[in-house]
């Protein structure tokens, strides 16, 4: 089963409930007047970080999320019930972007963090709200405001203290299964790990930390070869790297350990040079095999020849030799490693990196001409058309006045529209009548 760390979903917040037209019909109230209430607010949609989630697998088959609509208003001026908000759960480390522009909206790294992604529409006003001294009994009401619609891209980057890097079959999955309660799939082929696996290490002295066994890296990963981009996205989120190198001759990769070390570092550098600034420990794996000791000596000599001073820990996950020593060394390194990277990422969760453009407030519009028909293109005018109660003449006349105030009539006349031509706004048709 392939790891799902990206998904594109569509979200539709709830529409506001419709306002209603109603009048008082009570004994001893001869001039009862308007009595129609407002509609309730539509449901908002939030993202919320759930610490129990580890992947975006839930979004493979569920890609459409719709909040409920508000209830319509009632008589006696009663406001309709507002709809419940919809909460969409995502794992920590999820980055939300606009799918159409690829602009980042928010980076969710903190458990329990919630973020409002789509606003529900306000309730339409009932006829009580339109009463004036000159029109004390209006037959005007509004439909509910449409809820926001948005297509977003989700991208998960694993959050862990320690990341295991190395070629496939370097022993990362076996190591993780030995030192944590994680149970990754393990096999003797070169793409052992497809899914990032997280495990928690708990030491006898009370210290603990998380380890991520990430998809195996191959040459060309920084250019997207194999699982490269997926792997490197996750590496960005780790504080300490364990560079796992198979010291045996049974990996089947056909390259020496030092060459493997150089290739992995080159891929990390090509993707982001800052990755090589992370604290790193070289882990010599499979030291229980016959050829490993000699290969390790050659490896150390290559490091010395290039004046590379890097800590090395020898382990065998099969015999569990050296694993405790390695974990203590990692814990000590984490204690000394500033948490600047994490703080920077957490700070970004409080900053709105993307500003929603509210086209509904702009009075700009475009006019398109097809034969004797005219089409008005405008976010705000389309919204007003949706909110117009087209069952009453007064509501339609109010909408016509709004169009004139935006200059639509004048622009249509300038463009050549004649009385009786059909004007289409958001699928609804109106006969054009120019008023002097």
Curated annotation (Swiss-Prot):
Q: What's this chain's function?
A: An essential GTPase which binds GTP, GDP and possibly (p)ppGpp with moderate affinity, with high nucleotide exchange rates and a fairly low GTP hydrolysis rate. Plays a role in control of the cell cycle, stress response, ribosome biogenesis and in those bacteria that undergo differentiation, in morphogenesis control.
Tell me its family: Belongs to the TRAFAC class OBG-HflX-like GTPase superfamily. OBG GTPase family.
The molecular function terms of the Gene Ontology recorded here are:
GTP binding; GTPase activity; magnesium ion binding
Q: E.C. number, please? A: 3.6.5.-
Q: Where in the cell is it found?
A: Cytoplasm
Q: Does the keyword Nucleotidyltransferase apply?
A: no
Q: What is the protein's species of origin?
A: Oenococcus oeni (strain ATCC BAA-331 / PSU-1)
- The residue ranges of the OBG-type G domain are 160-335
HAMAP family attached to this UniProt entry: GTPase_Obg
- Domain Obg, residue spans: 1-159
Q: What is this protein called?
A: GTPase Obg
